[in-house]
Design a protein with these regions (language model features):
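Glycine-/charge-enriched secondary-structure boundary and capping motifs
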Residues: 2-7, 115-130, 146-151, 204-205, ...
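Buried hydrophobic packing segments
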Residues: 17, 21, 43, 88-89, ...
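Hydrophobic face of alpha-helices
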Residues: 18, 117-120, 191
């Protein structure tokens, strides 16, 4: 007799996954969360938002791209969730917002409860780092659509900001200083090229590189930095962030101009910080041109912000106090909207 399990969907495995992930999800709860895990929808009170003059909700949705494939190959699934959260909450923070809550979506060929719980463990860790509550999610088993061992991960975040505090870049002026925050490595973009490079050169993910201080796989799988606390620290120091860019897919050439008004150009000095060894290794092994690297990857800077020259010292101190590494990387000039790397 045919049943759902024989068709490829194991309901009992789904129940077990939920039980295993509960301990991780509970750690992310905030006072504003109403109800518990397992409801038809997640509920989050907005009562505290009344403290803002004109509260604006911000939303972000993203995934981890083909970095997920790397986690599958390495059979290490407890950090990829951090990437999913980071990709969403960093975008919200770029607009001056504070993340409120997060939801995840996992599509898999077969539900292996321990693996799903590991993925959610990473999601919960990302939520803890950004102080967002994990109020819901979905794990969808897709037999026949995906191989049993494969999965994809995406997320959705909601945050809030007072309208007067939204970072728009509108008042950026010539002379403003650009400050970059160090990345942990490749973060979550450009992994199709990463995999092609190392497939072509037949490099093993288990290969240890002295310049990396770890194996290739460990360096590539390093989770995306979450900059929410650092940007909050800057704001609490009394600094007005004029513009902010999350350096993701498209690298510097696509993302930096997004924070600029017309008639303003960002000039970034490549020698103002040390490019991480993983990027140098990728460029060398894959014979990738420098411009392509900067047009694809963060090259060591996961976030770039513009501040008034008088606020540079306070900004640097606030970022350091939040546990991130800042660099003064350039300045704003008059000129055609865009970015110049020199």
């Amino acid at each position: 007799m045919m049943d759902y399990k024989k068709a490829g969907v194991d309901i009992e495995a789904g129940y077990k996954s939920v039980e295993l992930m509960k301990e991780h999800v509970k750690k992310t709860m905030r006072a504003e969360v109403l109800g518990g895990l397992g409801g038809f929808s997640g509920a989050f009170s907005l009562a505290k938002i009344k403290e803002m003059e004109e509260p604006v909700l911000l939303s972000g949705t993203d995934g981890c791209g083909t970095k997920v494939k790397l986690a599958i190959i390495m059979d290490k699934h407890d950090t990829i969730g951090i990437d999913a959260v980071a990709m969403c909450v960093n975008d919200i923070a770029c607009a001056g917002g504070e993340p409120l809550f997060f939801l995840d979506y996992i599509a898999c060929g077969k539900n292996y409860p321990e693996k799903i719980a590991d993925i959610v463990k990473g999601v919960a860790e990302g939520c803890l780092q950004s102080e967002a509550a994990l109020i819901g999610g979905e794990t969808a088993e897709h037999p026949g659509l995906m191989p049993e061992d494969e999965y994809d991960l995406a997320g959705f975040a909601v945050g809030v900001v007072d309208e007067k505090d939204i970072i728009t870049g509108a008042d950026v002026k010539a002379g403003d200083v650009l400050i970059g925050m160090a990345s942990s490595g490749v973060h979550s973009n450009g992994f199709s090229l990463v995999r092609k490079i190392f497939e072509m050169t037949k490099e093993s993910l288990d290969t240890y590189y002295d310049e990396l201080g770890k194996t290739l796989g460990e360096a590539l799988l390093a989770p995306t930095r979450i900059y929410v606390k650092a940007l909050r620290s800057v704001k609490e120091a009394g600094v007005r962030i004029k513009a902010c860019s999350h350096i993701t897919g498209g690298g510097f050439y696509e993302n930096v101009p997004r924070m600029l008004p017309e008639g303003k150009q960002a000039v970034i000095r490549k020698d103002s910080y040390e490019v991480p060894s993983i990027f140098k290794l990728m460029a060398k092994k894959g014979q990738v041109e420098e411009k392509m690297m900067y047009n694809t990857y963060n090259m060591g800077l996961g976030m770039v912000l513009a501040v008034d020259p008088a606020d540079v010292d306070k900004t640097m101190e606030a970022i350091k106090a939040a546990g991130e590494t800042p660099y003064v990387v350039g300045e704003i000039k008059d000129g055609e909207k865009g970015v110049t790397l020199c």
